[in-house]
Amino acid sequence: MTKIKNDKLLISSDFYSVQGEGKSTGVPSYFVRLGMCNLNCGMSQLFTNKLMKEKTLADGEIFKGDLELEGKATWTCDSTSQWLWRGVDRDFQYLIDRWKEQGLYEDIVSGLIHVIWTGGEPTIKQHQEAILNFFRYWYSVDENAKSLIPDLAQRGYWPAAYSEIETNGTVVID
């Protein structure tokens, strides 16, 4: 199992798009897809362990899990890179740099572009700690961002970034 460090995020992918579900449907969003999931949708634990050991699947490969093939499940997870616990441990600065490189930074800081934490399962304990530490880091290193939204900064509302967590709803948040 990959150990998540408190100063890094295990990121499977990150990208800019438009939110396609929930109350923020249609809102420009930056998705941070984290590795690891606590479910084995459509697969037995034995099958999942075999896949993790052999690493026989390519990222994005669509297949049917053993339980789906046996008629014991109606579907199989479509996010292989997430439930196989894949991802790259990224320093917190990685996301800030990506947002700046893509010209999205000011709109993320001001909340015009939402940040969506998804996965995998972002509410797994290690991810909870890493996400909170990311925001602490962001605030500590990027005082200059306050000048982007001076009115909010003067009132103590920085960052004004809007963040959402997409979850499978099976993890209790402490």
What are these model-derived regions, one by one?
Residues 2-4, 9-13, 39, 43-174:
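Conserved Radical SAM active-site core
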Residues 12-25, 33-38:
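N-terminal beta1-alpha1 ligand-phosphate binding loop
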